[in-house]
């Protein structure tokens, strides 16, 4: 089984985080992760994209350090790394989450 790696808090790069947040679908996923403890691809039913596309976007969020994944059996549970993001980039996540969707 491929165990995903997560960047350490000290190695998070602002350019990678901002790139990950620049996509409207990933921004929506971040908002959903902020509202829920964990999400899986199947619990994002309101997002109208293929499962492979959704998996790709979660991978970008994970590799940038925004999200982390916990594997249990065949399921992958994603969660927001809010504390790590706040430590690395104070105020960034709060600012992003408070932007109206019509301004994305």
Swiss-Prot record:
GO terms for biological process: regulation of DNA-templated transcription. InterPro entries: ArsR-like_HTH, HTH_ArsR_DNA-bd_dom, HTH_MetalResp_TranReg, WH-like_DNA-bd_sf, WH_DNA-bd_sf. PROSITE patterns: HTH_ARSR_2 (PS50987). The gene is yczG. Pfam families: HTH_5 (PF01022). Residues 40-63 bind DNA. Residues 6-100 form the HTH arsR-type domain. Transmembrane segments: none annotated. One of its GO terms (molecular function) is DNA binding. This is Uncharacterized HTH-type transcriptional regulator YczG. Keywords: DNA-binding, Repressor, Transcription, Transcription regulation. SMART domains: HTH_ARSR. PANTHER family: TRANSCRIPTIONAL REGULATOR, ARSR FAMILY, TRANSCRIPTIONAL REGULATORY PROTEIN.
């Amino acid at each position: 089984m491929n165990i995903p790696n997560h960047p350490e808090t000290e190695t998070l790069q602002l350019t990678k985080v901002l790139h990950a947040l620049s996509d409207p679908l990933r921004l929506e996923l971040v908002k959903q992760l902020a509202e829920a403890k964990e999400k899986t691809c199947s619990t994002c039913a309101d997002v109208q994209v293929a499962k492979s596309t959704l998996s790709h976007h979660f991978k970008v969020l994970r590799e940038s350090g925004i999200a982390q994944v916990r594997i249990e059996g065949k399921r992958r549970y994603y969660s927001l790394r809010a504390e790590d993001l706040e430590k690395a980039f104070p105020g960034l996540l709060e600012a992003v989450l408070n932007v109206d969707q019509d301004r994305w």
